[in-house]
Amino acid sequence: MKWSALECASIRAWEEELSRLTINDLQLMKNKGEKIAAGVCYDVQMTKIWERAGVDLLSVGDSVSRTFLGMEDDSEFSLDAMLLFGKAVARVAHRAVVNVDMPTVTCNAGPKAVEEAAKRIKSETLADMTKVDIRTQEEELFDDVLAVIGTGFPVYPQIGFDVWEPSHGSTKDFDHVMKWCNAVQDAGAVMIDLTNVSHEIYSAVANAIKVPVIGGQSGPEADGRIYVSYLLTGYRSDSIDKNDGTPSAAKYIYEIASDAVSKIHSGTW
């Protein structure tokens, strides 16, 4: 039987839909002891690279404001800007679950603003969930988590401590994160990003909490690991001069660009 172009396109779309992971698939991975691989990215090309590598979760982080846009203050980064990057990643992600962060400025604007933003992220980016960062402000911002849940859009709260501080591992730290991980889980969160705690705390929380618990500093004791693409690959200008053996995509690009510039200047290209 010969299929028409339209029929072939429909079959490809159907096959892609069957292969697409869901939030429930991530939960099943935890239940079976399989680890969740997550990557933070903001653009089409990095999304395609991660997908080819087999990533399970793509997170469009509000860190794009600093990494790509050169902003020094999160208050400069708007929801409209976040939606632009969220659309780019969701448009080409065919397998991974996609998260789009709630911008910090929106989180600080109150539950009503968060509710409206969640609706826009869901409808305009077609992402699977949104991450609400309530680190160090769990008491003040917990209602933001409830606001997203009230819209019916899955929420993925970030709990814990700032990454520039030493790792937190005291009994007090454990009690703090355990309290709030239980709170967001009981409220209906589908996943938790636990930030900057000791491996012992990651282990204890991941074992006690039913939903997946992953983080950017976690080891195999958690349910998975998040890597920021541009740190992982060294796609940062400050990695050009490093000689510590870590990956440096920037150095590779720099050498190619430098050679091209030299040839143009000398008229030998």
Language model: regions and residue ranges:
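Alpha/beta enzyme core
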Residues: 2-269
